[in-house]
Amino acid sequence: MENITIETEFIKLDALLKFAALTATGGEAKQVMADGMVAVNGETCTMRGRKIRPGDEVTFAGHTLHVQSAQ
């Protein structure tokens, strides 16, 4: 599991995948979500604009990201 620290209230799912270098572009992030390859808190998520908040866990391609607040 990898911890990702954000300084804002939330980060959009597609931006998180790019920030964590799990996808190279927003288009790639959109495609892997549309294909049902991303899970948020254990549930498949296809909404690229989903707001990911501290405490959420995102899983993709064998990686699990735990989002935490910088504060």
Regions found by a protein language model. Give the residues of each.
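C-terminal structural segments of small proteins and small subunits
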Residues: 44-71
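Generic structural motif recognizing short loop/turn segments at the entrances and edges of beta-strands
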Residues: 2, 36, 63-65
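A detector for short, charged/polar N-terminal pre-domain segments
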Residues: 1-8
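A basic, amphipathic helix-loop patch mediating RNA/tRNA/ribosome contacts
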Residues: 11-54
